[in-house]
């Protein structure tokens, strides 16, 4: 009797055979000429679960970068992928991640197998959402680790993850704090927007992360502007990397369907131009880029008050994570809206159907320009881009763009489209000290952003019109700016502070034993928080910073503009008030009486002020010496008479003109009354004539005015009358018959 086969064993054997066939297809892919003309995901050597996930997510056709990057990534090569914005780079590295773990039979007990690092939180969330869609048919566990979330909750789940999508700062924090977080089994490392991650801002963080990763891993780098720096590639320990470039025949890095233009405007006219643009594009979806978060907040708060007629949103790195995700969701769903943002949404974020990308501040280089305009014209759709350049920035920046083969045209603004809002901004700053403070911070942050730029040919710091720019923001004058350090050092410190984890900063403040000081660990109750509660509006912190008087001037990282309050010696009236207090009930009653209080106050005095602001009494008399010094009495009298005569003549001219105007107005009113009266009389006459005609028509016609109907009645020979009842009726009937 034969032994029955185990179905689980048969299933395992079938799975092994499928894996071996799939591995064979991957190894041999590209040898046949037909493999080079792949157009669909089904034609690639992918697992059934991945193909099914792509189909369910409506991904059927491969883009150029996907069919060039996926096969070598499946074969285990390190890649440097460069493609236009909106060309599908996310799928180009997520599909190899799933296939790598699937062919290695990865399970929960194997730990973390793939690591995807993104420079911004919003981009990491977007990558995670795409991974959930295409990987739904696999059994891998994936997680998202970004700043702004609960660290303890993330730490509990890290040990069970197979695929981790994260930002550099939060990943390094978990590597330092979370026990059991092991990166020794990582098979694949993916850096999205690699040129941004490898720059100076993330240098220390990325070096610490790379030290803990295995050397034999596979590394994929993707960006629209890829780095080829030897030092960067050496840091990543790439082994014979392959450079993948989509559309190598074309030279431009921007989408073909993107219409790119620029306008040359003065710095002080930028907000006026932006206002006019928004007023004429209220039915479009627009992203407006600024160089700093302070400028974003100022423009958002002021434009929101002025109401340009289009929904406004703002997004910058100083917002809480929940607020940032809410703004991204609202803008993605909106059909017409304007988003004021910094460069945190310049890379990788896919906002659907963006019509316009407006860059109010000049980008630092051509690569930043490419990433910004890439938010529009994605996946073959059309879009438009507009760049604001000052006359000093225009020549050098256009040269940089032409060197990258970026086609851009110059536009001129119609005079009828220009509208100045300087007066409105000045009124807002005058009414609200919070808006004024935001304007000061926006002014300073713009100056700092220009000062720290490397390309001094484009950004000429000394040629900025400070007073005119401050006036355009509604400020009474240009704030003072402290720039004690070099531009390179300031930029390095700003990037390090911006990208460093706040939790790591807290650990750095701990002692040698790793214990944080008691002051920072002090328990604060609900009652303490209630008494510490301050003004709850969005600008309360800025207002407090403006009015506080104990700021440290030597603090280099603090605010540039703070109002210093100085103590003055004030005369105290407490002693007089105590002396005037009533001593009895009667005196207290008299003190409450208005009549009695007026007796004690005495007579009031009237003071006049001259043109210089000096006070004078209402009547001032000259001394005898002053009177004699002015000259003889006769000459003074003559001068006085002449002066008064001249004043009276000038006043007489005005009085005559006023009387003339009053007479003309009186005459005009009289004629108007007469005209109205004539119209009323004419209307009455016309009505009377109409009434008389009706009366005549109602009268009985004469014998010679009889109509046809009366003739017909007479021709009948019949006279219809009522039955006579009296003698008078009989007499009248007799007379009628005789007449007939």
From Swiss-Prot:
CDD domains for this protein: DEADc_DDX10, SF2_C_DEAD
Ranges where the Helicase ATP-binding domain occurs: 70-244
UniProt-listed Enzyme Commission number(s): 3.6.4.13
Motif (Q motif): 39-67
Highest taxon, organism lineage: Eukaryota
Annotated spans, Disordered: 1-37, 565-740
GO biological process, one term: rRNA processing
Amino acid composition bias (Basic and acidic residues), ranges on this chain: 7-28, 636-662
Binding site for ATP: 83-90
GO annotations of cellular component type: nucleolus; nucleus
Keywords: ATP-binding, Helicase, Hydrolase, Nucleotide-binding, Nucleus, Ribosome biogenesis, RNA-binding, rRNA processing
UniProt-annotated location(s): Nucleus, Nucleolus
Catalytic activity: ATP + H2O = ADP + phosphate + H(+)
Enzyme kind, highest EC tier: hydrolase
Subunit description: Interacts with the U3 and U14 snoRNAs. Associates with pre-ribosomal complexes.
Family affiliation: Belongs to the DEAD box helicase family. DDX10/DBP4 subfamily.
Entry remark concerning the domains of this protein: The Q motif is unique to and characteristic of the DEAD box family of RNA helicases and controls ATP binding and hydrolysis.
Protein name: ATP-dependent RNA helicase DBP4
């Amino acid at each position: 009797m034969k032994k029955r086969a185990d179905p689980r064993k048969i299933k395992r054997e079938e799975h092994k055979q499928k894996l071996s066939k799939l591995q064979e297809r991957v190894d041999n892919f590209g040898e046949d000429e037909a493999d080079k003309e792949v157009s669909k995901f089904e034609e690639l050597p992918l697992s059934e679960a991945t193909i099914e996930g792509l189909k369910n997510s409506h991904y059927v056709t491969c883009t150029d970068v996907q069919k060039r990057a996926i096969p070598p990534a499946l074969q285990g090569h390190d890649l440097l992928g460069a493609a236009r914005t909106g060309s599908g780079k996310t799928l180009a590295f997520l599909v190899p991640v799933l296939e790598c773990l699937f062919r290695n039979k990865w399970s929960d007990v194997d730990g973390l197998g793939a690591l995807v690092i993104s420079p911004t939180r919003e981009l990491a969330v977007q990558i995670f959402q795409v991974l959930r869609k295409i990987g739904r048919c696999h059994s891998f566990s994936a997680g998202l680790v970004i700043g702004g979330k609960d660290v303890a909750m993330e730490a509990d789940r890290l040990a069970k993850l197979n695929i981790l999508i994260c930002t550099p700062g939060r990943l390094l924090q978990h590597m330092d704090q979370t026990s059991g977080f092991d990166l020794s089994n990582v098979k694949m490392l993916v850096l999205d927007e690699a040129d941004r991650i490898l720059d100076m801002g993330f240098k220390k963080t990325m070096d610490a992360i790379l030290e803990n990763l295995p050397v034999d891993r596979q590394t994929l780098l993707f960006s629209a502007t890829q780095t080829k720096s030897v030092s960067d590639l050496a840091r990543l320990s790439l082994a014979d990397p392959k450079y993948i470039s989509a559309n190598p025949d074309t030279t431009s890095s921007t989408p073909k369907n993107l219409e790119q233009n620029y306008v040359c405007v003065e710095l002080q006219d930028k907000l006026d131009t932006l206002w006019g643009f928004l007023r004429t594009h209220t039915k479009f979806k627009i992203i407006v880029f600024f160089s700093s978060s302070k400028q974003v907040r100022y423009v958002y708060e002021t434009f929101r008050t002025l109401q340009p007629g289009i929904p406004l949103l703002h997004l910058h790195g100083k917002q809480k994570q929940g607020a940032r995700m809410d703004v991204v969701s609202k803008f993605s769903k909106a059909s017409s809206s304007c988003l004021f943002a910094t460069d945190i949404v310049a890379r990788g974020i896919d906002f659907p159907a963006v019509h316009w990308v407006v860059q109010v501040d000049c980008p630092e280089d051509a690569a930043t320009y490419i990433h910004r305009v890439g938010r529009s014209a994605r996946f073959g759709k059309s879009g438009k881009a507009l760049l604001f350049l000052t006359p000093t920035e225009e020549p050098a920046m256009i040269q940089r763009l032409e060197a990258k083969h970026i086609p851009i045209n110059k536009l001129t603004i119609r005079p009828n489209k220009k509208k100045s809002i300087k007066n409105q901004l000045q009124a807002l700053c005058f009414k609200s000290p919070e808006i004024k403070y935001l304007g000061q911070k926006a002014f300073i942050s713009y100056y700092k952003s220009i000062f720290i730029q490397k390309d001094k040919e484009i950004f000429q710091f000394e040629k900025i019109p400070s007073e005119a720019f401050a006036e355009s923001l509604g400020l009474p004058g240009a704030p003072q700016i402290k720039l004690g350090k070099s531009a390179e050092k300031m930029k390095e410190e700003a990037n390090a502070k911006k990208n460093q984890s706040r939790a790591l900063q807290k650990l750095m403040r701990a002692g040698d034993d790793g214990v944080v000081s008691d002051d920072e660990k002090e328990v604060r109750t609900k009652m303490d928080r209630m008494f510490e509660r301050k003004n709850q509006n969005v600008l309360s912190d800025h207002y407090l910073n403006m009015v506080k008087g104990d700021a440290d001037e030597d603090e280099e990282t603090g605010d540039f503009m703070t109002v210093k309050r100085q103590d003055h010696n004030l005369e105290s009236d407490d002693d007089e008030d105590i002396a005037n207090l009533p001593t009895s009930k009667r005196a207290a009653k008299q003190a409450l009486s208005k009549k009695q209080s007026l007796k004690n106050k005495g007579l009031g005095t009237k003071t006049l002020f001259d043109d210089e602001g000096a006070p004078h009494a209402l009547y001032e008399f000259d001394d005898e010496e002053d009177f004699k010094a002015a000259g003889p009495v006769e000459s003074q009298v003559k001068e006085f008479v002449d002066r008064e005569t001249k004043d009276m003549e000038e006043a007489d001219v005005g009085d005559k003109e006023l009387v003339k105007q009053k007479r003309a107005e009186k005459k005009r009113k009289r004629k108007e009354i007469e005209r109205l009266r004539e119209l009323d009389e004419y209307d009455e006459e016309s009505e009377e004539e109409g009434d008389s005609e009706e009366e005549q028509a109602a009268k009985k016609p004469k014998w010679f005015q009889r109509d046809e109907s009366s003739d017909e009645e007479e021709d009948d020979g019949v006279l219809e009358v009522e039955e006579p009842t009296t003698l008078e009726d009989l007499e009248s009937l007799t007379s009628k018959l005789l007449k007939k």
